[in-house]
């Protein structure tokens, strides 16, 4: 009997898109049940986001390893938790998937669930350890808050509430992240998508309440005509005042002073954050322009 292949065929994605269950099953006449995509971190069939639920059930019944891992030690449970696929996560748990299996950076599937409240609720209900720590010594709640962007705030508030009800406490790190989230949102509030503004603002207020964090004040931007008065007692404080009042969330500033502050900030980020990795003639032009 010929030895079966360890890798999936190049057209496996197309077969999944076609939703032909018989054709998908036929792949495993020649491939191992745990065969993987050679071009995607050795991701096995069970971990494909769009893999049909019926094929998952069939593969497990045929003997596929329900806890099979990719190059980063992520299991199918981790993959489907990442995209909030409650149905597939429920199937994997029902079939005996390891709810505490650790991927790279010591992350369990609960870390993979991120800010998705639905799959987080399911994992917690099934006994996932909310106090697990990754390699940064953060809990799933802390790790989730650390990555939240403004568009995620509403979901993050619901997810954070689940963790707090499950017994986690508002740590110093978690509170710092709430302030960061608030500062980022307020900086971009003026140009935030109005369709989601009310929902997002409500989520932010809920985060402040859950973690007992003082709300970040709304930005008061300069009107482009009044005198610009900076009152900080250090140049750093005066610079931040100028940044907050004169620099828009994107695009050029409305005043010359604001544009100088914006360019200085951009150069500062390139020097300190990127170690001049993107430094080129355009950056030098900007530096020369504000240096007089």
Predicted regions and their residues:
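Alpha-helical segment of the N-proximal tetratricopeptide repeat
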Residues: 10-20
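Ankyrin repeat domain, specifically the short helix-to-loop turn at the C-terminus of the second helix
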Residues: 26-33, 57-65, 90-98, 121-129, ...
């Amino acid at each position: 009997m010929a030895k079966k292949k360890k890798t999936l065929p190049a057209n496996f994605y197309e077969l999944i898109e076609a939703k032909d269950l018989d054709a998908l099953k036929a792949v495993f006449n020649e491939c191992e049940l745990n065969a993987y995509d050679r071009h995607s971190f050795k991701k096995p069939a069970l971990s494909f986001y769009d893999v049909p639920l019926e094929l998952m059930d069939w593969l497990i019944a045929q003997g596929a390893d329900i806890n099979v891992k990719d190059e980063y030690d992520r299991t199918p449970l981790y993959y489907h938790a990442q995209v909030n696929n409650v149905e597939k996560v429920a199937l994997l748990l029902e079939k005996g998937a390891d709810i505490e299996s650790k991927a790279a950076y010591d992350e369990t599937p609960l870390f993979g669930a991120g800010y998705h409240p639905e799959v987080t609720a399911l994992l917690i209900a099934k006994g996932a350890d909310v106090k697990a720590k990754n390699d940064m010594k953060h809990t799933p709640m802390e790790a989730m808050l650390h990555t939240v962007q403004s568009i995620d705030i509403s979901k993050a508030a619901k997810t954070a509430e689940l963790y707090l009800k499950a017994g986690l406490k508002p740590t110093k790190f978690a509170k710092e992240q709430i302030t960061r989230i608030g500062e980022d949102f307020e900086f971009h509030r003026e140009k935030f998508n109005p369709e989601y503004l009310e929902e997002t603002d409500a989520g932010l207020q809920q985060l402040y309440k859950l973690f007992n964090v003082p709300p970040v004040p709304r930005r008061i931007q300069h009107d482009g005509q009044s005198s610009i008065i900076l009152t900080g007692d250090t140049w750093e404080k005066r610079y931040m005042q100028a940044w907050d009042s004169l620099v828009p969330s994107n695009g050029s500033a409305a005043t010359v002073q604001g544009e100088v502050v914006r360019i200085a900030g951009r150069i500062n980020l390139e020097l300190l954050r990127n170690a001049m990795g993107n430094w080129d003639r355009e950056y030098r032009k900007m530096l020369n322009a504000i240096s007089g």
